[in-house]
Every structure is written in C-alpha cells, then in structure tokens.
C-alpha cells in the first residue's frame, strides 16, 4: 500500500476514483481540516459520479422546522388512533412518516456524506465526536439527532472543544435523550409547586452524570455523587418538549429557540460546586461548567488517549498521547490544533489501525465506486 492510501485508510475514507492523489500527503491531510463540508449525495440509485450534488435545502431543515414536523407527526398519530381524517389508512401512515420524520433522511444524508464527500478527514473527525456525544434514536429525539451532528459537531470542528461541549450538552437532542427536559431543581419554584399539587417533580441526574463520566473528565477524576448532583442542578431548567407551543416557550423562557431554552422557574437557586469549582446560579452557569470541564487535566488526558487510540494506534504510546495533550494545552482546546497533532502522530506511526465496521464499509464503497445507498 502506498503512502497516500495508507494515510487515507488510517485517517480518512479512501480516495474516490475521480480524485487525484495528493503529492504531499501530510499537507493534504492537515488542509482537510478546513475543507468545505457540504452534504453531498446522489439523487438516484442509477446516478453517476457527475450527478453528485449537495443535498436539497428542504431535506436539511432547521431546528424550528424539525420541531414543527414532529408536532404534526404526533397530531396525525393521534388522529390515526381516533380514526379521524383518514389517518388510519396505510397510505396516510406512510405519508405522515415520510413527510414529518427526519430519522431515515438524516441517516441517509450521513451515509452519503461519507461516501461522496470531498472532506474525508473532516468527516472522520465528525464521526468520532458524534460517537463521543452519542444520543439515542428514540421517540421525539429521532427528528433532531441529525441536527446535533451537523450543527453542534460538524459546525464546531474548527472551534474549541469548550464550544463543542457546550453546544452538544445544550442541544435539544442531548437534553431530550437524557430526560433533562423534565429535570427541575429540588428547591425550584416548579418542584415546590408540583409537589404541593401531589405530582412528581425533581432532579434528574442522567445528563449531569454523562457529562462528567463520558463527555469530559471520566471516572479517573474521582468525582463524587455530590459532584454529579451539583452538575445536574446546573443543568436543571435546560430544554423543553419539542411539541411545546411557541407561546408557552415565550412565557416560560422568553424565547422560541429550542437550543437556547432555559426555564428559570425550574432552575435550582444558589451557587453550586462541581469538583471544587464554584458555578454561579442562572443560565450562564452551564457555560461556566462546560468551560471548566473542557480544560480540566483529566478531560485532556482522557480525550487525548481516546483520540490516539482511534486514529493513531490500537495501543498508542505515551509519547503519542502526550503529543496530543501538549497541543490541547498549547491551543487552549483549539480543535484544529488538537486534530493536527492527531494527524501528525497517525502519519508518523506505521502500525496498522483497526477501523469501525462503518468506516471500513464507507472506504470500500468509495474505493470501488460502488452504488450502495439509494438516492
């Protein structure tokens, strides 16, 4: 295997037949970090290479439109159960799913990106971070997972890890998947009012736990259950049900932006302490927390090791990990600098690298110029 293909197999998705091989593979690889990233694909299963085009804008709706589509879908499902307006017919059911659900469309767009994209290294880093910030394809979350990947992950690959951590944590997909949209502080107005009326309410620590355990410092930091609950209290009040009417969103949070919705009456009053860091009360507390975690020594060590194992070697050396850690610290978490360090160590290492089955499939399709995914 020549050097161009070795590097593309290790760090990218392999060269498509119409793509000329770069002479300077290292410069090419680093330049890929700032490549343009349109969602490329094909219209039909019979399409040729000349037919590769950007996905239509109507198939890449914004967050507000996705919430509207989900609300319509749920309303039609209610009519289906009640046998109203013909929604119980098989044709109506299929039409409702096709028109208003985004899960399958987003999945196909992701596959098309990987097969037809010209930014193969950037896509690999997008996939790495999308896996790191995994959310499940359940219930109303299916309409917003693709938006998280495109707008919280891909759109921030040239930013900082601090920015990506904040954007991923506060995204409706993450808040919905881990039930933070129902979490209220133990001493919040919402919790007291609901309990007075005999209803359940209170803190859900799912996201607070994952934020520490999986997304940032890892268990090596030896945080406590108190740290987890305090992180959850910082997150209390963030997010809302996608079906919530816009007038209610304005009333409870003075916004109709699902990605910036903070319900003050659900928030835990007072300052919080997470791993020794004092976090102020209010909406800005989440940014304080994610900024602190993004540059924590344990986060840097954990994620530098994870990046090295994914891209450099199945058993990365301490020098590989230290090289990435130093880039993280020197650039204050700048992802371009972190990813450049990963590329440099991956090229330097001659060890073969195990690939995810998904990555292997995309590489095989690109190399063979096969048409595997429908348009």
Give the role of each language-model region.
Residues 1-90, 94, 106, 147, ...:
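His/Asp/Glu-rich metal/cofactor-coordinating catalytic motifs and the adjacent surface-exposed loops
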Residues 99-103, 141-142, 316-317:
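Helix-boundary capping/turn motifs
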Residues 128-136:
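Long, hydrophobic/aromatic-enriched structural stretches that serve as scaffold segments
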Residues 121-125, 137-144, 176-179:
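Short, flexible active-site-proximal loops enriched in glycine and acidic residues
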Residues 91-98, 102-123, 127:
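Structured, charged N-terminal subsegments at the starts of enzyme catalytic cores
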């Amino acid at each position: 295997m020549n050097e161009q293909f070795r590097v593309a197999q290790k760090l990218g998705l392999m060269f498509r037949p119409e793509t000329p091989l770069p002479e300077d593979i290292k410069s090419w690889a680093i330049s890929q970090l700032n490549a343009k990233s349109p969602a490329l694909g094909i219209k039909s299963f019979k399409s040729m290479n000349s037919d590769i085009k950007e996905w239509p804008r109507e198939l890449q709706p914004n967050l507000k439109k996705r919430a509207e589509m989900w609300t319509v879908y749920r309303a039609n499902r209610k009519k289906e159960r009640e046998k109203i307006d013909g929604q119980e017919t098989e044709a109506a059911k299929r039409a409702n799913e096709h028109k208003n659900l985004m899960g399958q469309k987003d999945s196909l767009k992701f596959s098309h990106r990987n097969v037809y994209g010209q930014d193969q290294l950037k896509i690999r880093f997008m996939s790495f971070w999308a896996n790191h910030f995994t959310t499940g394809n359940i219930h109303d979350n299916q309409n917003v997972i693709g938006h998280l990947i495109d707008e919280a992950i891909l759109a921030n690959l040239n930013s900082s890890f601090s920015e990506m951590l904040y954007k991923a944590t506060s995204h409706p997909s993450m808040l919905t998947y881990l039930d933070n949209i129902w979490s209220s502080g133990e001493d919040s107005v919402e919790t007291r009012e609901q309990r007075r009326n005999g209803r359940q309410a209170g803190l859900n620590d799912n996201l607070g736990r994952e934020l520490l355990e999986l997304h940032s410092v890892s268990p090596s930091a030896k945080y406590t259950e108190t740290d987890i609950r305090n992180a959850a209290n910082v997150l209390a009040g963030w997010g809302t049900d996608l079906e919530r009417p816009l007038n209610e969103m304005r009333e409870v949070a003075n916004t109709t932006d699902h990605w910036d919705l903070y319900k003050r009456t659900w928030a835990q009053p007072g300052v919080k302490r997470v791993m020794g860091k004092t976090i102020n009360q209010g909406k800005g507390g989440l940014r304080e927390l994610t900024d602190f975690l993004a540059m924590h020594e344990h986060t840097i060590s954990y994620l530098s090791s994870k990046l090295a194992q994914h891209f450099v070697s199945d058993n990365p050396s301490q020098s590989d990990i230290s090289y990435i850690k130093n880039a993280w610290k020197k650039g204050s978490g700048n992802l371009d600098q972190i990813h450049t360090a990963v590329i440099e160590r991956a090229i330097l290492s001659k060890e073969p690298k195990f690939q995810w089955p998904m990555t292997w499939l995309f590489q095989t399709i690109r190399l063979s110029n096969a048409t595997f995914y429908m348009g």
